[in-house]
Every structure is written in structure tokens, then in C-alpha cells.
């Protein structure tokens, strides 16, 4: 492992010890904000320090074992220990490099998931419903919580557009690579002649930002319209103007919310989604500027970026970003999408490591 990496790990270990002492300090314990910040930093260093300590111990064990190589009675055992430890050290060094990669501060946040039907008419709406079901089942398997923010159902089933909030551990970090164009190839239920059609939906995943990180939105930049809810809501449907539509005039972003019976709650939900979309627009602008310099697995943010195809006749799913194909379409549509998500994350980390090597 490079001396520069070892030096950085030594510094992180020292900081970890310093934080441990600070968290036992009475003045820090009395200051909730400071205690919370130090606790968070301490927790973030736990894994890298523990892994580094294991790496140091294995290297120390190898040095001790090498001293026994001249002893005929101990040579075989020492050689075996050295071989095993070197293999583990190699794995630890790869893991440490990944742990040292720059972290996306948004990864730990909850996420807004937006699915919008694209080309393909009614079939696109049905596919949007299929995608929503897929992500819902995946969220359930992770014990994440799903809360509907806004839904516009299509006539033949499914959705013209649906926005949900998914809450849980590192939701955005797991789902952020799902943003882009999703294409389906199959015989629609409405097709009488058995012809295969191609339809598409766009998926956008945005982090739910804490209030402290939300962009300042000038109220003068907003147009807020209220109207009667057309969705579920029992006796309150179409009796009060509880639904809210907010237009951000500078960007043209429009957010609607009618899920709650309370206009106040719908407005709060819509503003939260709007803030995330405004931040996303800025991130997309930056991504477009960087797109020519290095492959960007997160995409440029362009909703037309085709990232995945679901081919029903062949029972396959293909991720076009890394040329990955799996022939378990039924399982994927039932929420078993880790085998699609994890390879993308791994590839992204490999790209980050390559970028760091280029800079070295």
C-alpha cells in the first residue's frame, strides 16, 4: 500500500482517538449540536479505522512468522500463516481504498422517487406501475418506508406520474443510479395481434435534503395554485381545495401534491420535493459540464438517457451503462434488483479509483 495512503490512515486513526476523548468531555456532552456532530464523525471513521487496525496486525503477524522460517519445526506452519495473511491483506487494501473514496454527502439521505410514463401511450403508464411495484418490493425487502407524495393514475392502470418518498438507511446512495430512461419490450395487454411494442418511462431519484441544506427559495418566485383533489380521500374528495400545485417560475419546475387531506400538509410535501428538484437541476448542469472529461455512470441527468431495457419475450434485463444482462426478469420485477444495483455501484467506485490514480 502506498506510503501516502498509510499516512492518511494514520491521521484518520489519530482523529478517531481524538473524537473518542472529546465525546467523553463534559463540555461537549452539554452541547447537543457539538456532541451530535462529533458522534456522527466518529461513527463515519469506525469502519476505516477498524479495517486499518486489522491490516496493521496482519502485517505485524507476518513479520513475526517470517522469523520462524529458519526453524524446521515451525517453517510449514509459518509459511501457511504468511500466505493466508497476505491474501487477507490484499482484500483489506482494496477495501481501504474504497473506504477512502470521496463520499457523496447525499448518500445517507432518504430519497424522492419519481416515475413518469413516456412514449408508448397506455402501455407506458402500465409499465410505470410495474416499475413502482418493483421499487416498492425492493424497499420492503430493505425495510424502508414508502410514502406517496403525488400520483396521477392512467386510464388503463398504472400511472402517468407517481412520486414517493422512501425513508431508510442510505436510500439515496442505493437508488441514485436508477435515474434515467427505462425501456420495456413486450406484447401489451391492449394489443390484439400479438405484436411486440416498445414503451418507455423515466425515473428520477432525488435526495430528501435536511432543512439546513435546502436552497433558499424566494416566495416571489413561486406560483401556488390550489384545486380539488381527484384521488383517494374518502368523503373529503372534491369538497375542499386541498390539492396544491407549485410552480417555480425561474426554472419552470412544477410540483403537485394531493395525497393529504390537508392543504397545509400537501404544500409542505410539495415544497420539499421542489427543493430537491432545484438542487438536482444544478447538479445536472454540473454533470453536463463534466460529461466530456470522464464516463459518468450517474448520467448527465438527461431523462432521455436510456439506462435499462426490460425484454419480456426473452426474459432478460439489460443495463446499457455496463453491458450487464440478467435472465431473471420475473425476479427483477418482483423487487430483486440488488444484482442490477450493486454492479453499478462497484463500477462507479472503480471509476473513482481510476480517477484518483490519474491524479496521483
Curated annotation (Swiss-Prot):
Keywords: Cytoplasm, Methylation, Protein biosynthesis
Modified residues (N5-methylglutamine): 235
GO molecular function, one term: translation release factor activity, codon specific
Record PTM: Methylated by PrmC. Methylation increases the termination efficiency of RF1.
GO cellular component, one term: cytoplasm
Subcellular location: Cytoplasm
Primary residence: cytoplasm
Gene3D superfamilies the record matches: 3.30.160.20, 3.30.70.1660, 6.10.140.1950
Protein family per UniProt: Belongs to the prokaryotic/mitochondrial release factor family.
HAMAP family per record: Rel_fac_1
Function of the molecule: Peptide chain release factor 1 directs the termination of translation in response to the peptide chain termination codons UAG and UAA.
Record's protein name: Peptide chain release factor 1
Organism whose genome encodes this protein: Haemophilus ducreyi (strain 35000HP / ATCC 700724)
Record gene name: prfA
Amino acid at each position: 500500500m502506498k506510503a501516502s495512503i498509510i499516512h492518511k490512515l494514520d491521521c484518520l486513526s489519530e482523529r478517531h482517538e481524538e473524537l473518542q476523548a472529546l465525546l467523553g468531555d463534559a463540555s461537549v456532552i452539554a452541547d447537543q449540536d457539538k456532541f451530535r456532530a462529533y458522534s456522527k464523525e466518529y461513527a463515519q471513521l469506525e469502519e476505516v479505522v477498524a479495517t486499518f487496525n486489522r491490516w496493521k496486525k496482519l502485517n505485524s503477524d507476518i513479520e513475526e512468522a517470517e522469523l520462524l522460517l529458519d526453524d524446521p519445526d515451525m517453517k510449514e506452519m509459518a509459511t501457511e500463516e504468511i500466505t493466508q495473511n497476505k491474501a487477507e491483506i490484499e482484500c483489506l487494501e482494496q477495501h481501504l481504498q474504497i473506504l477512502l473514496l470521496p463520499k457523496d454527502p447525499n448518500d445517507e439521505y432518504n430519497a424522492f422517487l419519481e416515475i413518469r410514463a413516456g412514449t408508448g401511450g397506455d402501455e407506458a403508464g402500465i409499465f410505470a406501475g410495474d416499475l413502482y411495484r418493483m421499487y416498492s418490493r425492493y424497499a420492503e425487502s430493505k425495510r424502508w418506508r414508502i410514502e406517496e407524495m403525488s400520483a396521477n393514475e392512467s386510464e388503463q392502470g398504472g400511472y402517468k406520474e407517481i412520486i414517493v418518498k422512501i425513508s431508510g438507511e442510505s436510500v439515496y446512495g442505493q437508488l441514485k443510479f436508477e435515474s434515467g430512461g427505462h425501456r420495456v419490450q413486450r406484447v401489451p395487454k391492449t394489443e390484439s395481434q400479438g405484436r411486440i411494442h416498445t414503451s418507455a418511462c423515466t425515473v428520477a431519484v432525488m435526495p430528501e435534503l435536511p432543512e439546513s441544506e435546502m436552497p433558499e427559495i424566494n416566495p416571489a418566485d413561486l406560483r401556488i395554485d390550489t384545486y380539488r383533489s381527484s384521488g383517494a380521500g374518502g368523503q373529503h374528495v372534491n369538497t375542499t381545495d386541498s390539492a396544491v400545485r407549485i410552480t417555480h417560475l425561474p426554472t419552470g419546475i412544477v410540483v403537485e401534491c394531493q395525497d393529504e387531506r390537508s392543504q397545509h400538509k400537501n404544500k409542505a410535501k410539495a415544497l420539499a420535493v421542489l427543493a430537491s428538484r432545484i438542487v438536482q437541476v444544478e447538479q445536472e448542469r454540473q454533470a453536463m459540464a463534466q460529461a466530456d472529461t470522464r464516463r459518468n455512470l450517474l448520467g448527465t441527468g438527461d431523462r432521455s438517457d436510456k439506462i435499462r431495457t426490460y425484454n419480456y419475450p426473452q426474459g432478460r434485463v439489460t443495463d446499457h451503462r455496463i453491458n450487464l444482462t440478467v435472465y431473471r426478469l420475473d425476479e427483477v420485477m418482483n423487487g430483486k434488483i440488488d444484482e442490477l444495483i450493486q454492479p453499478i455501484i462497484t463500477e462507479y467506485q472503480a471509476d473513482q479509483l481510476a480517477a484518483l490514480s490519474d491524479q496521483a
